[in-house]
Regions:
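Consensus positions within tandem repeat domains that build extended binding/scaffold surfaces
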Residues: 1, 19-24, 42-47, 65-70, ...
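Structural signature of tandem-repeat unit edges
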Residues: 3-17, 27-40, 50-63, 73-86, ...
Length: 229
């Protein structure tokens, strides 16, 4: 409570971890200098720091914890380390000014990590192997997504209410060559997947009463759980 008026934080070079809720609710904090040896940012560390505008993580940071930057409403730019592997649940929840973050080296993104990041329009998930429920839900500007070449399960809520999903035509929505989900009411009697489709998502066409025939491509290597239940 005594730290709510903090405006700038410079951490010693030897610091390797910032503890949970360390700067929670420091609503006047504008500048944080991340030490070179820092390895992780714990849960809720900067949650509610509404005046933070940008953050650059040191090369040693591998983990961003649950709700670490939740509610940082003026945070517009985040530079992750090339070694950052994991983004925790709700890590950037309601960072509604965020428009730039480099995710190309991240392998795991937790549930709700970027919900309500309304200005985020472009992301690179090239090396991501795990995407949580609602990870990018209600990212209303999100239109450009670079997907990995091999991912075998993505929750069907992961990109709900994004421009990418809402602007897609009815039918099969692909994440690269991964058959992600059906958009709209699929009432055709035949379902045909495009060439080069390598996998079909879990729960892809559950409880559909219309499809009588499914054409699977030779490229297919995986069919998810309950895909056609």
């Amino acid at each position: 409570e005594d730290s709510v008026d903090l405006k700038k934080v410079t951490l010693p070079d030897g610091v390797t971890k910032i503890g949970p809720s360390a700067f929670y609710g420091c609503s006047k904090l504008t500048t944080v200098n991340i030490p070179a040896k820092l390895e992780e940012i714990d849960d809720y560390t900067f949650s509610g720091c509404t005046q933070l505008t940008d953050i650059k993580l040191s090369e040693s940071v591998t983990y961003v914890g649950e709700s670490a930057f939740e509610g940082c409403s003026n945070l517009n730019s985040v530079t992750l380390s090339e070694n950052t592997e994991t983004i925790g649940d709700c890590a950037f929840y309601e960072c509604d000014s965020l428009y730039s973050i480099n995710l190309e080296n991240v392998s795991q993104i937790g549930a709700g990590a970027f919900v309500y990041c309304a200005n985020l329009d472009d992301i690179d998930l090239t090396n991501c192997s795990l995407i949580g429920e609602n990870a990018f839900s209600v990212c209303q500007s999100l239109i450009n997504i670079k997907f990995p070449d091999s991912i075998y399960s993505i929750p069907q809520t992961a990109f709900e209410y994004t421009l990418w999903e809402q602007s897609a035509p009815d039918g099969v929505l692909y994440a690269g060559d991964f058959a992600y989900k059906i958009i709209g009411d699929f009432t055709d009697s035949t379902l045909t997947f495009k060439d080069n489709t390598y996998a079909i998502n879990d729960d892809f066409l559950s409880y559909n009463e219309y499809v009588k025939k499914i054409n699977l491509p030779d490229s297919l290597t995986s069919i998810g759980a309950s895909a056609f239940e």
